[in-house]
A protein has these predicted regions:
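Hydrophobic alpha-helical bundle signature of multipass membrane enzymes
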Residues: 1-81, 86-122
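Interfacial helix-loop-helix junctions of multi-pass membrane proteins
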Residues: 51-60, 117-148
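Short, Lys/Arg-enriched charge-dense amphipathic segments
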Residues: 76-84, 131-134, 151-157
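C-terminal membrane module of polytopic membrane proteins
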Residues: 142-170
Length: 170
């Protein structure tokens, strides 16, 4: 089977898969760039931290089926820092929150509910520890915030690239 669901924690973890699909189907280039940037940074951090201080960086003993589709087998020897699932959902939720612009206590709580659910599921599934999910949360938030600040510049550059390509084609 393409996606493996053995527990409620697997089901909750799939929220991150739906977040990644949302990035693609919205065709919002800033969200797509942010998603790719989150994936890139997340993978770089995992490669860099492999073999570092195990209580923080190594996945919990017995971690299995921890990839985006809840498959992949035993991976407890690999780095789990930061959590990619939490990174992607944190990026999505904070991108949406910053986009609506109504940042008050109620909205912060509401937009953090999916993030906390995924973080809890990743810990309970045994794929990450608390430090790893907090790092994923901060990474997703940081990318969302930086893209929000520089959104106009990113859109201008994208328009310049589109113009350049259309001029070359014509």
């Amino acid at each position: 089977m393409f996606i493996k669901i053995d527990s409620i924690y697997d089901l909750i973890s799939l929220i991150s898969l739906f977040a990644n699909l949302y990035f693609i189907f919205t065709m919002d280039i800033v969200l797509i760039i942010g998603c790719m940037f989150c994936i890139l940074l997340h993978n770089i951090f995992k490669e860099i931290t492999y073999g570092w201080y195990p209580p923080i960086f190594k996945r919990p003993n017995g971690a299995t089926d921890c990839n985006l589709f809840n498959t992949g087998g035993l991976i407890d020897h690999k780095s789990g820092f930061p959590s990619g699932h939490v990174t992607s959902i944190s990026f999505l939720m904070y991108s949406l929150l910053l986009k609506i612009g109504d940042i008050d206590f109620k909205n912060i709580i509401l937009y953090n509910i999916p993030i906390m659910l995924v973080a809890y599921a990743r810990i309970m599934k045994g794929c990450h520890n608390l430090i790893q999910v907090v790092a994923g949360y901060l990474l997703g938030y940081s990318v969302a915030y930086m893209l929000h600040i520089y959104k106009n510049e990113v859109n201008i550059k994208i328009d310049e690239i589109k113009t350049y390509i259309s001029d070359k084609i014509s």
